[in-house]
Curated annotation (Swiss-Prot):
This is Probable mannosyltransferase KTR3. Residues 1-27 are cytoplasmic. Residues 45-83 are annotated as: Stem region. The active site is at E295. It comes from Saccharomyces cerevisiae (strain ATCC 204508 / S288c) (Baker's yeast). Residues 45-404 are lumenal. InterPro entries: Glyco_trans_15 (IPR002685), Nucleotide-diphossugar_trans (IPR029044). The gene is KTR3. Present with 704 molecules/cell in log phase SD medium.
């Protein structure tokens, strides 16, 4: 009796698996290899990771990285990105009508620096910002955009000012062609920048500030977190250009300052930078000051008893109105007298312009590394007489760059 063997039937899915099992096996093995490679790479990556990936200027440890001679002379280090943000903020005082000049400044700061760090930006105005201003600027900044209105008493003529005397003085200055000599808004701005901006509630959560004005240009990539730089190097005030003040705008500022110091000698730092602002050990003021169109530093310094009491003393004298005291000489005198001179820093390697002056790194290797687009021949940093950077280096006992 013959036996008929029946062929065992298999489900269609099983037939498909058998048919393609070699290809599936190969793909699975390939996937395992790729995942293993990615895991290995993530585990071996240096902990000093740039905050944002894919940029050409993320500051990582490199033996090829160059520091400007002036930074070496001042004894600082450039911090490596560690992914941790400081309590820093960009601060801009602007009107709604400044919008289309301001957007260029914002793009310069964002493209050259903040698109990697995403620090917040605070905008302040003596009038409410328009919807257009908020819409355009908030689209440009990489951090949070915050908008505040200046309190009325911070942008008005205080009660102790004799308005008739004020009008007489300012109109007389206008006839002498003193810059902004007759301007009332300019005086409000200088007074606000001198004594009130860091008191605004929007700045309470921050420790460091970078003042960004309209009509500025940054020519170079900033290769490190500039706020972290201040912190790790124990710097309280930084500048990029220093110039001489127009003497007829501040005829009594120094005498008023000396009266304050006489009453409050405790605020005068033993290791101060007096030699930067005076050629005769404090008898007279030589008009040198840090240009505040680029200004970066510690908010806590301006919140200190020394600075607040100094400003209040100046304010009570009426000089912001009867004369035309600027915020730049006020800030500069305060920093030079109340800080250790080692807490002040001259920034190089950034490239900066605000009408009518330009800072361009003197070293070609720095300009190339930082992708600077400034014209070296237009740099005024080391020009003698009107500009004061040489005097700052002399007062701080720092070496000048070769060739200066």
């Amino acid at each position: 009796m013959s036996v008929h063997h029946k062929k065992k039937l298999m489900p269609k899915s099983a037939l498909l698996i058998r048919k393609y099992q070699k290809g599936i096996r190969s793909s699975f093995i390939g996937l395992i290899i790729v995942l293993s490679f990615l895991f290995f790479m993530s585990g071996s990556r240096s902990p000093e990771v740039p905050i944002a990936q894919g940029t050409s200027v993320s500051r990582v440890a490199s033996k090829d990285y160059l520091m400007p001679f002036t930074d070496k002379s001042q004894g600082v280090i450039h911090p490596v990105d560690d992914g941790k943000k400081e309590k820093g903020v960009m601060v801009t005082l602007a009107r709604n009508s400044d919008l289309w000049n301001l957007v260029k400044s914002i793009r310069h700061v964002e493209d050259r620096f903040n698109n990697r760090y995403h620090y917040d930006w605070v905008f302040l105005n003596d009038q409410p910002f328009s919807d257009e201003f908020k819409r355009v600027t908030s689209a440009l900044v990489s951090g949070k955009a915050k908008y505040g209105t200046i309190p009325k008493d911070h942008w008005s003529i205080p009660s102790w000012i004799d308005t008739e005397k004020f009008d007489e003085k300012r109109l007389a200055m206008g006839k002498l062609d003193i810059p902004y000599g007759s301007s009332v808004p300019y005086r409000h701005m200088c007074r606000f920048q001198s004594g009130f901006i860091w008191r605004h509630p929007l700045l309470e959560e921050y420790e460091w500030f970078w003042r960004v004005d309209t009509d500025i240009t940054l020519f170079c990539d900033i290769q490190y977190d500039i706020f972290k730089f201040l912190k790790v190097n124990n710097k309280k005030y930084g500048f990029i250009l220093s110039v001489s003040e127009y003497e007829r705008t501040i005829p009594t500022l120094w005498e008023t300052t000396k009266k304050f110091i006489k009453k409050n000698p405790k605020f005068l730092h033993k290791n101060n930078l007096m030699k930067f602002i005076s050629n005769d050990d404090g008898d007279t003021y030589n008009m040198c000051h840090f240009w505040t169109n680029f200004e970066i530093g510690s908010l806590d310094f301006f919140r200190s008893d020394a600075y607040r009491e100094y400003f209040d003393y100046l304010d009570s004298s009426g000089g912001f109105f009867y004369e035309r005291w600027g915020d730049a000489p006020v800030h500069s005198i305060a920093a030079s007298l109340f800080l250790d001179k080692s807490e002040i820093h001259f920034f190089d390697g950034l490239g900066f312009h605000h009408p009518d002056f330009t800072s361009c790194p003197i070293e070609q290797k720095i300009r190339l590394q930082n992708k600077c687009i400034c014209e070296p021949s237009k740099d005024v940093t080391w020009t003698p007489d009107y500009f004061c950077t040489r005097k700052y280096f002399s007062a701080g006992n720092y070496k000048l760059p070769p060739g200066i």
